[in-house]
């Protein structure tokens, strides 16, 4: 697959669309030997481990929405850096929304090879609902989310 660099930003947007839809076609965006990182999962390799990550998240997350229209997307060669926000709900019924709750901000680093994701690193706090009270070292009062 031949892809020009500006198309890589669109491929990153497509990743978020498929992720939000829970589409099995999400895996098609990844190279067979893709490497990825997600907090508390660690580093994974290949589509089988990626499916394991997605299945685990699907067991906890009821819905998630990425509004890519406001994202900061930076292209550097075959790498796309994305700073963005999410909103969603956990299967427990707890909800999160950036600006309203502590969870919801993230940064992804996509490295593309041959028009596919060859490496993806996701940096976020996976405590979407803010359950980890001990992690709020400065307290919750007076904070902007």
Residue ranges of model-derived segments:
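Short, low-complexity N-terminal intrinsically disordered segments enriched in polar/charged residues
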Residues: 1-32, 140-145
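Hydrophobic pocket/interface hotspot
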Residues: 15, 26-27, 34, 46, ...
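A solvent-exposed, acidic/Ser-Thr-rich amphipathic alpha-helical stretch
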Residues: 24-77, 85
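Short, solvent-exposed loop/turn segments at secondary-structure boundaries
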Residues: 40-41, 80, 94-98
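Hydrophobic/aromatic beta-strand elements that line small-molecule binding cavities or substrate pockets
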Residues: 68-74, 105-111, 124
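Short, well-ordered beta-to-alpha junction loops that form the rim of enzyme active sites
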Residues: 84-86, 122-123
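Exposed beta-sheet edge and beta->alpha loop/turn motif
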Residues: 85-113
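Low-complexity, intrinsically disordered terminal/linker segments enriched in charged
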Residues: 119-145
């Amino acid at each position: 697959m031949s892809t020009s660099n500006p198309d890589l930003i669109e491929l990153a947007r497509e990743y978020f669309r498929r992720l939000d839809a829970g589409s099995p076609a999400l895996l098609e965006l990844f190279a067979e030997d893709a490497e990825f990182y997600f907090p508390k999962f660690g580093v994974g390799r290949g589509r089988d481990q990626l499916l394991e990550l997605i299945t685990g998240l699907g067991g906890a997350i009821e819905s998630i929405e990425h509004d890519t229209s406001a994202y900061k997307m930076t292209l550097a060669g075959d790498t796309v850096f994305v700073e963005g926000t999410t909103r969603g709900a956990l299967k427990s019924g707890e909800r999160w929304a950036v600006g309203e709750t502590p969870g919801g901000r993230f940064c992804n680093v996509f490295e593309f090879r041959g028009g596919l994701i060859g490496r993806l690193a996701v940096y976020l706090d996976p405590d979407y609902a803010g359950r980890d009270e001990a992690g709020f070292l400065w307290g919750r009062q007076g904070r902007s989310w």
